[in-house]
Amino acid sequence: ACLPFHDEKTDAVWNQSALNAWLQADFHAAFTDAEWAAIAPVTLADTAADGNPEWQNTDAEPAETHVFLLSYAQVMQYLPEQEQRKVSGTEYARSRGAKFLGFTTIGIGETDWWLRSPGKESYDACFLDVRGAVGTKCVTEKLGVRPALWMDLSADRNAFPYEQQVQAKQLAEQGDYAEATALLDTLGDYAGSAALAE
């Protein structure tokens, strides 16, 4: 996706942002109930220490969520090398305005993406540019969105549509077409299931 952090020029407060609301509603709808149940809830209790130390940061109200954006501190912890922070926006994101530095004809390149931490000014939010460098942008700018979540690795994934697709493909390859078809029928309109049946 390619979205603004906020719909209007206002303070970059993650819990109150339009982008957070989109993740909790529209993005949530992309998951089946079984998939959503396997996403572990997390309490985001961002403090001033989670933001870029070169900018003024304040503590945020703790909030429980399932899907979120990484904070500045999390990026430094999990993606310490600038090269690791580069991400190529999807065709969907590019069609909605995501910046793309590279070769669009072959889909190789990088895209800017939001972090949930405040930026340098009160109406700015932190982001990573196409080089993987930390920057600050006005909250009304449209940038790439890279959702983050914590999965419960002990969850039974057999009910996940992707796992069911894999099982159906294996059954079809073994010649058990009736069982494969029955499994695909349970997937309904899940994206990609029709292509697998061909």
What are these regions (language model features)?
Residues 177, 181-198:
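Short, charge-rich amphipathic alpha-helical segments embedded
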Residues 1-160:
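Collagenous Gly-X-Y triple-helix signature in extracellular proteins
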Residues 21, 25, 29, 170, ...:
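Charged/polar, solvent-exposed surface patches and flexible loops
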